[in-house]
Amino acid sequence: MGQNGPPPSIALFPVTVPVQAQPPTFSADEFRQALGMFATGVTIVTARAADGSLVGLTANSFNSVSLTPPLVLWSLALSAGSMPTLSTGSHYAINILSANQKALAERFAKKRDDRWQDVAFTEGIGGAPVLAGAAASFECFNRSR
């Protein structure tokens, strides 16, 4: 055939068959410990539930998405106790912790009934708690779930 004819039916490049991933040889705890070695900023995400109660959790899965418009992204496990409030509520705050707030980060990383005891905050947009002493705080509207 001429130059404008159909392409040849012979493959010019070798075709490779993908190899299936093997199950990990490490435990979930070992994986968590290794990920914990990754230096990253730490945040506490806060909100007010429909019943007026406060929720908050330590999160390091925080990223900027866009400067214009200002958009951020963070992740939460579907099994998290605060998921119902954060997935249905309209507002929340992301509080970027300062270097001297390690104890606060640890407090909000664990399940505790007294998590909010003696924690200084102001009420932000939609009732979301804005933590005193945070290096920065973002008052957010839930755009995507």
Where are these regions (language model features)?
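Active-site-proximal mixed secondary-structure blocks
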Residues: 2-145
